[in-house]
Swiss-Prot record:
Keywords tagged on the record: ATP-binding, Ligase, Nucleotide-binding, Protein biosynthesis
GO MF annotations in UniProt: ATP binding; glutaminyl-tRNA synthase (glutamine-hydrolyzing) activity
UniProt family annotation: Belongs to the amidase family. GatA subfamily.
Classification via Gene3D superfamilies: Amidase signature (AS) domain
Protein name: Glutamyl-tRNA(Gln) amidotransferase subunit A
GO BP: translation
Entry's EC annotation: 6.3.5.7
Positions annotated as active site in the UniProt record: K77, S152, S176
Pfam families: Amidase
Subunit structure: Heterotrimer of A, B and C subunits.
């Protein structure tokens, strides 16, 4: 059953080949048998999920119509609210916080009869790229348990890679869906800013965050987006970008002009560079034309991103003070000491580091030097992408400079920040991007290529990703590090 895509599972439900209860029980058995080694989940909603599965089976038995996601098990990153379920953001600060309402994406998934399995591990408050910054436990890469799965949506990527669920929700602030997707050999889609509601997502960077799906195949990205994309009155940043469905769009003619910023590829590990150019060759054989585009301004993307993201994080996380929300210290002599102790005890080192950086760049003495200049460069970066899209339909870039790194190779914070060089610009410019598996490194680790489009061209980007998937002959990648999970290799 784990070899079936979400779309295939739904077809099996519709055709009465499988019951929703049987599917749900099967995937819980996989999680309970193997997740101890991987650590993808923080909590499970088993009783809730099986009750919903039974109700959907009853609907089928009565001949009632069922939703788009009927019978599909879905994991949810633990910064997205499900009513009555803990939302910890993988932080001691929110260790006991129970969500009082559903996020819009969760509400729409359940309206379409999706089955929510549980909450997935992440870097604390989505700040990190290894899932080693979780306050509770690390998540391991199913391809090599001594390597990181990426982050911050590392639990989501690992869960899909291990086939604990065919779809997982992640959030992408600077690459947090696409980078772990590439590290774990799955598909990751970062929608345009405003394409998916952020209502019920715990905010990190409010002008950067987007919720998106991680899946095994591009068709399931389209299915998920059809279920939960679109305007939401509870999120004023959402827009109606799309005509028709994502699933229908996959069969339309693929854009043929692909831009590549070749001057921005020098930092790639050699086998990653070879793999990227092999991916371009696949698209050329399919009929695309590859041209060079000038995106030299991208060299400023990482520092600008960490200025903007840290400033927004410092503002958003100010609410976690031990009074209104979050952990409160056991003893303090006065209110100011209570604030300080509660935040010191509740936040981990990486979150603290970014709050300090954000407060620094927003301080009266430094705001003009850092934050305002950073926003000016962000505007230049947006202009550079717009100029590039006047010459091409889609931009292709690597996702990561290297395959997944080992625990002992986890770098100092600044070096880890520089790993985001190929992903953060997409968020700064509000663009959609999809990461699709592109093969294996010389060490047998998965690699990914990303396709980037203009804001609102999400369906077109999925078309390109689907075309690459079909022509690359890499339909699904199966990891082999966990005994009994599956055989390993490419299918």
């Amino acid at each position: 059953m784990y070899r079936k895509s979400a779309l295939e599972l739904r077809d099996a439900v519709v055709n009465r080949e499988l019951s929703v209860t049987a599917i749900t029980e099967y995937f819980y058995h996989r999680i309970e048998s193997h997740d101890e080694q991987i650590g993808a989940f923080l909590s499970l909603c088993k009783e809730r999920a099986l009750l919903r599965a039974s109700r959907i089976d009853d609907k089928l038995a009565k001949g009632d119509p069922i939703g788009l996601l009927a019978g599909i098990p879905i994991g949810v990153k633990d910064n997205i609210h499900i009513t009555g379920v803990k939302t910890t953001c993988a932080s001691k600060m929110l260790e006991n916080f129970v969500a009082p309402f559903d996020s819009t994406v969760v509400r729409r998934i359940e309206m379409e009869d999706g089955i929510l399995l549980g909450k997935l591990n992440m870097d604390e408050f989505a700040m990190g790229s290894t899932t080693r910054y979780s306050a509770f436990h690390p998540t391991n890469n199913p391809w090599d348990l001594e390597r990181v799965p990426g982050g911050s949506s590392g639990g989501s990527a690992a869960a899909v890679s291990a086939r604990f669920c065919p779809i997982a929700l992640g959030s992408d602030t600077g690459g947090s869906i696409r980078q772990p997707a590439a590290f774990c050999g799955v598909v990751g889609f970062k929608p345009s800013y405003g394409a998916v509601s952020r209502y019920g997502l715990v905010a990190f960077g409010s002008s950067l965050d987007q919720i998106g799906p991680l899946t095994t195949v591009v068709e399931d990205v389209a299915l998920a987006m059809d279920a939960f994309a679109g305007r939401d009155p509870k999120d004023s940043t959402t827009r109606d970008f799309f005509k028709g469905t994502f699933s229908q769009a996959l069969s339309l003619e693929v854009p043929k002009l692909i831009g590549v910023p070749r001057g921005f590829l020098d930092g790639l590990q050699e086998d990653c560079k070879e793999n990227f150019f092999e991916a371009l060759a696949v698209m050329e054989r399919e009929g695309s034309r590859i041209i060079d585009v000038d995106l030299s301004v991208l060299k400023h993307a990482v520092p600008v991103y960490y200025i903007v993201a840290s400033a927004e994080a410092a503002t958003n996380l100010a609410r976690f003070d031990g009074v209104r929300y979050g952990h409160r210290c056991a003893q303090a002599d006065n209110m100011h000491e209570m604030y300080a102790r509660s935040r010191k005890e509740g936040f981990g080192k990486e979150v603290t580091r970014r709050i300090l950086l954000g407060n620094y760049v927003l301080s009266a003495e430094r705001q003009n030097i850092f934050y305002k200049k950073g926003m000016a460069v962000r505007a230049r970066l947006i202009d550079a992408f717009q100029a590039a899209f006047e010459r091409c339909d889609v931009i292709a870039m690597p996702v990561c400079a290297t395959p997944a790194i080992r625990d002992q190779d986890v770098l100092d914070p600044v070096s880890l920040y520089l790993q985001d060089v190929y992903t953060v610009a997409v968020n700064l410019a509000y663009l959609p991007a999809i990461s699709v598996p592109s093969g294996l490194s010389k060490e047998g680790l998965p690699l990914g290529v990303q396709f980037i489009g203009e804001r609102g061209s999400d369906q077109q980007i999925c078309q390109v990703g689907y075309s690459f998937q079909e022509h690359s002959q890499i339909k699904q990648l199966y990891p082999k590090a966990v005994n009994g999970l599956f055989d390993g290799g490419i299918e």
